[in-house]
């Protein structure tokens, strides 16, 4: 058996975890002149591959009560900008193919932040409220849900003008767009229906009855099937998009309140705030594959691009867990704060940015091994975080 590498350095601190990065300065030409102890140190350093430091990706953190978005340089990590936005911001979404972040506020407005300027360039007025916001695949068009009145507002993202709207029914819950960009789907908890709307004609294509109190939605990559969490029942429903018909009702055992679809579309993860487990559904055959334990109140998930790993935040116990999807195992669990409610994986997959609504902070977490690097205070009630593939000092997309 190969002996373990010796531990070279140790560091403990009563406050937030710290990361110190450095490099050896001895030229290899002087290797023969080093004493035996120096050779042991170099050998151990070679054995221990140092993990890479964070790159200067920018995390955009949405502070609901501070009415701001904080831009954090993860290489610091340090705050590089505090950006005032419309009141009661809830969500940040990157516009596809552009260096813009759209911030949706419950006050009925959308603030458009430009990078690298890190300023609000435009504010779009949607109505009394602004709910879910989705983009066309090319990022040229956006569709905003105004839940209270039940309207879908069509936007041209280049001119920032409204190009139309569709009125459905008041108090809609959620909205999704098919990956091909052709169909919008909205869930109506009042009538237990889904609405299907054409993005080209701006007309209602049809509806379908699902389970009780439909909520969050997830759409397969081929735009064929939509899954909806029936939050008033202990089940989810699957509907065919082209025919607007029900394919299956899948019993869960508890009321679902969240859905997360793997990037490859093969499996759907169903979460419930009533328990401490998640249900894995075969998205192609509509059957339950497995139930895995989680912490209390799973609220946010992030996948690796190859669909091999999932990172899950559980708000009621302050943990982030790493799940090996391939082997169906909990790889590790880490306490990151009081109430983590959102998380984002950096494009290089080495780090997680985790927003904690209770402590008003952003935790920077290394993914391998799962470990806390530091915590940055960001504002009052951070509720969302995204990390686009942009770096400070980088030119072009």
What does each model-identified segment do?
Residues 43-397:
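Predominantly soluble domains enriched in secretory-pathway, periplasmic, or organellar proteins
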Residues 3-35:
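Bacterial N-terminal signal peptides that target proteins for export
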Residues 32-44:
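Bacterial N-terminal signal peptides
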Residues 1-3, 164:
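Accessible peptide chain termini
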């Amino acid at each position: 058996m190969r002996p373990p590498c010796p531990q070279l350095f140790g560091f403990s601190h009563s406050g937030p975890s710290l990361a110190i990065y450095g490099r050896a300065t001895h030229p290899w030409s002087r290797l023969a002149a080093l004493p035996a102890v120096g050779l042991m140190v170099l050998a151990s350093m070679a054995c221990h591959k140092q993990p890479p430091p964070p790159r200067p990706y920018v995390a955009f953190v949405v502070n609901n009560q501070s009415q701001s978005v904080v831009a954090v340089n993860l290489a610091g990590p340090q705050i590089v900008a505090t950006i005032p936005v419309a009141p009661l911001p809830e969500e940040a979404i990157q516009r596809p193919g552009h260096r813009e972040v759209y911030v949706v506020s419950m006050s009925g407005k959308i603030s458009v932040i430009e990078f690298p300027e890190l300023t609000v360039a435009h504010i779009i007025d949607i109505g009394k409220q602004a709910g879910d916001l989705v983009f066309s695949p090319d990022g040229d068009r956006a569709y905003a849900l105004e839940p209270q009145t039940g309207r879908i507002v069509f936007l041209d993202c280049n001119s920032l003008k409204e190009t139309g709207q569709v009125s459905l029914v008041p108090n809609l819950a959620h909205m999704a767009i098919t990956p091909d960009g052709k169909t919008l789907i909205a869930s109506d908890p009042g009538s237990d229906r889904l609405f299907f709307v054409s993005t080209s004609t701006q007309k209602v294509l049809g509806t379908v009855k699902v389970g009780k109190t439909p909520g969050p939605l997830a759409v397969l990559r081929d735009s064929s099937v939509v899954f909806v969490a029936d939050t008033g029942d202990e089940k989810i429903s699957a509907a065919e998009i082209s025919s607007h018909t029900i394919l299956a009702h899948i019993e869960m055992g508890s009321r679902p309140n969240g859905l997360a679809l793997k990037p490859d579309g093969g499996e759907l993860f169903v979460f419930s705030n009533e328990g401490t487990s998640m249900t894995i559904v075969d998205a192609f055959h509509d059957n339950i594959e497995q139930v895995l334990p989680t912490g209390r109140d799973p609220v946010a998930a992030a996948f690796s691009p190859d669909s091999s790993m999932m990172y899950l935040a559980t708000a009621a116990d302050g943990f982030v867990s790493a799940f090996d999807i391939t082997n169906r195992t909990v790889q590790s669990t880490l306490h990151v704060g009081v109430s983590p409610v959102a998380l984002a994986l950096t494009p290089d997959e080495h780090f997680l940015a985790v927003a904690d609504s209770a402590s008003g902070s952003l935790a920077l977490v290394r993914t391998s091994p799962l470990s806390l690097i530091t915590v940055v205070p960001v504002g009052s009630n951070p509720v969302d975080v995204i990390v686009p593939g942009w770096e400070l000092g980088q030119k072009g997309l």
